[in-house]
Amino acid sequence: MATSSLCSSFTSQTCNPHSRPHRKTLTLPGSVFLCRQFHLNSPSVSKTRRIRTRQSGPVASLGGLLGGIFKGTDTGEATRKQYAAIVNTINGLEPKISALSDSELRDMTFASRERAQKGESLDSLLPEAFAVVREASKRVLGLRPFDVQLIGGMVLHKGEIAEMRTGEGKTLVAILPAYLNALVGKGVHVVTVNDYLARRDCEWVGQVPRFLGMKVGLIQQNMTSEQKKENYLCDITYVTNSELGFDFLRDNLATSVEELVIRGFNYCVIDEVDSILIDEARTPLIISGPAEKSSDQYFKAAKIADAFERDIHYTVDEKQKSVLLSEQGYEDAEEILAVKDLYDPREQWASFVINAIKAKELFLRDVNYIIRGKEVLIVDEFTGRVMQGRRWSDGLHQAVEAKEGLPIQNETVTLASISYQNFFLQFPKLCGMTGTAATEITEFESIYKLKVTIVPTNKPMIRKDESDVVFRATTGKWRAVVVEISRMNKTGRPVLVGTTSVEQSDSLSQQLKEAGILHEVLNAKPENVEREAEIVAQSGRLGAVTIATNMAGRGTDIILGGNAEFMARLKLREIMMPRVVKLVAEGEFVSVKKPPPSKTWKVNEKLFPCQLSNQNTELAEKAVQLAVKTWGKRSLTELEAEERLSYSCEKGPAQDEVIAELRNAFLEISKEYKVFTEEERKKVVAAGGLHVVGTERHESRRIDNQLRGRSGRQGDLGSSRFFLSLEDNIFRIFGGDRIQGLMRAFRVEDLPIESQMLTKALDEAQKKVENYFFDIRKQLFEYDEVLNSQRDRVYTERRRALQSVNLQSLLIEYAELTIDDILEANIGSDAPKESWDLDKLIAKIQQYCYLLTDLTPDLLLNECSDYEGLRSYLRLRGKEAYLQKRDIVEQQAPGLMKEAERFLILSNIDRLWKEHLQALKFVQQAVGLRGYAQRDPLIEYKLEGYNLFLEMMAQIRRNVIYSIYQFKPVLLKQDQDKMENQKSGKRNARPPTDTNPDPVGTVEPSTSASS
């Protein structure tokens, strides 16, 4: 389940201490801010820069606080030298590889695959493989990977993290090591942060390995198990981090081999690795099942929370995201609910009231979630996207639904869970790439054992990161932001404004409307999400103003002057989609996740740089008519049509006649648009390039750097500036008393603050937020490590039961160990023979297995001379009883026993593992208090968790063998009539269930008597 945080973070900037200070005056006619001046890069700030140092990274100061992280850091030249020899070898192979025909190039794959599978090392195959991929990319995509991209590929092949700047072609880089590592035949996973990027990368750069004879697969959320299995078996599979993790958990809940979809783990390339392994690592992946809860309690608690007042009835700790009822709060709640104790275990009102107050104070609409229809949808704080299908756990989501007056969905109980840390550590070889990893080198190396390597840029980065501007109050900050946007807009420079919430983006949008500034908004709201790629791709056009809620993982480059190819695709899409996408018939089932295509696909004409010529309009019409004739009028689903359009809008040869015609039209339209976008690009560059405005610091500096990195791609001109307020969440929550003192000292809202004390206070706040969230991730990892070893054991046992053809040996082992448990519980190993209570022992054994009716004290005394003899004899009888029961069932219903055994093992593992997870959650909450008794909570958790685990594994064995011993097939009359068919191998019996009697086989209640 996803959780959300109200905290933001910020970044330090390294500036030239010798730069000449300059003064800028920002004014907006008609504003309260009229004629107010604020001075940037003042001499006092420059002095501060000279004296402030940080051990952990770049110099921090007010005049560049949290600014350009890239200045003064490793430029990757050492990496360039390290790999220079191999790059030269690859370049030396280029003439030879270029001379090969397409089929000869494809044959290189088969030859390399054969060599790899015979044991030749991938390192020795690397130069040739990279040269082949480079040539294929040139032929298929029209892109020749630069030398620095080859270096990036080699870094990934070594199992390291490659830090590559935005716009350096990370998507293409991933193909190089993916192709090389796929040669061994064990599969490669390329992991992205969302479905859109997975599909885009598979359809675009996936053409390269496909052209070279490899199978490339794509996993999407709405696929069937069969489709997923087929795609996971491909040489290279594109998939999102969450879908891969959930498929792993679902595989470990499967009840038949046919339901398994994932092949074994081999090599994994993670795009935006910091977002996945750092930002999302605080929240484990959880698959939940429904649990019965009364919705009335949520609504009553919501009314109480609404009536209660902060600091009177309760206090709020925004840093810990917790609330605490005061004495008056307890008394008033108990009086309203007419209960004696909020913590009465029969009703447990306390959790409902606490969650209701959390929903009121800490989980805010259009910040942490949005409302769509009658659903509360979580907004990912790192990407600004809606997290479809994700819910907060422990009743919190229901509390938010009650607050909003929406229908309450059932509370959930955890069926399976895993942290991203432990999930990805299952890969024998793991690597990743991002534009912002340097800030988290320590965490990558300590938890994941991944080295971070800086890859040099192809062209020098010349973006100018301006000084940060800090105000006392948010009102002054937002006025200054509007002034900045207006000033840039007048020069024609495109502006990208980053906000941290939907609420902020809507508020700023309203202010820009009042100022008469045309703009686009990109946030989690449905009407904006649909146009995401369109909005981002055109953010670099002359005079464009774009407000975006977080830019992590957006995946679309902002090209100065506009993206001609993207516009050409939109034009072709506008013409084609209405004619080939089928309409949903009335009454036909429509997926909630995929609404019917009621839209027209019509694009605002202002988006296109020019009116399309008649010649290209006719070319597009002709291609679309051929598509309609070949595919059928309105015969495709929207997803199918989008996939075919994607294939059409690529470069390189196409075998299919329709795709070839559409591709030709796309290329011609692109050429026409490029004439205009190139002219516009020159104007944008002359104006200064893309200007990025940050409005608040996130808790992760990397997200701020990703926002900055949208400007200055591939050596483009650009600039960035952040506007901050002491009322921003990061300073308010983590700033401490010093920030509060500064807020009282500086009374003027509209003037920026310059103070060495402030610089130090903000620097400390930054360290606090980074350390705080690192500690959370580290603690989650440490606690999940305990669970991970248990999870591995349980999943191994479960997979053994699922995939074994014959479970006889496993069941005999269960029978013998259960007999051992009963014996040890009733007769001590050191007890003399004369003191054995055999009547009690026999009663307990016969309670488990009614077949052992012949056991008597005299028989045991005669057969067994000592304790070990007794153990061996009872083990033998337990085994014989199991084999006897197996024969009885097989005679009545051939083949049923195998199904019953598998079903009973899987169902008991799943049920008891679910209960174990709940128990561990309570243990983790309880051990936290033991720190006050000078006891390490983690060690306490390990000890108690281990004891609970041993008891759970024993209980699984006992329940299963008890159910097997008690199992009595009940045949229906038609089954008796068809006994002959059953004996010949045709079975009409269904597997038993552990709850309700089955028409064919029933299992007695498996609440086995405790030994």
UniProtKB/Swiss-Prot annotation:
GO cellular component terms, semicolon-separated: chloroplast stroma; chloroplast thylakoid membrane
Polar residues bias locations: 1-17
UniProt xrefs under Gene3D superfamilies: Helical scaffold and wing domains of SecA, P-loop containing nucleotide triphosphate hydrolases, SecA, preprotein cross-linking domain
Region (Disordered) location: 1-22, 976-1011
Disulfide bonds: none
Chain segments annotated as coiled-coil in the UniProt record: none
Principal location: plastid
Keywords of this entry: ATP-binding, Chloroplast, Membrane, Nucleotide-binding, Plastid, Protein transport, Thylakoid, Transit peptide, Translocase, Translocation, Transport
Pfam families: P-loop_SecA, SecA_DEAD, SecA_PP_bind, SecA_SW
GO molecular function: ATP binding; chloroplast protein-transporting ATPase activity; protein transmembrane transporter activity
Subcellular location: Plastid, Chloroplast stroma; Plastid, Chloroplast thylakoid membrane
Its EC number(s): 7.4.2.4
Catalysed reactions, as listed in the record: ATP + H2O + chloroplast-proteinSide 1 = ADP + phosphate + chloroplast-proteinSide 2
Entries under InterPro entries matching the protein: Helicase_ATP-bd, P-loop_NTPase, SecA, SecA_CS, SecA_DEAD, SecA_motor_DEAD, SecA_preprotein_X-link_dom, SecA_SF2_C
GO annotation, biological process: intracellular protein transport; protein import; protein targeting; protein transmembrane transport
Protein family according to the UniProt entry: Belongs to the SecA family.
Protein name per UniProt: Protein translocase subunit SecA, chloroplastic
Species of origin: Pisum sativum
Gene: SecA
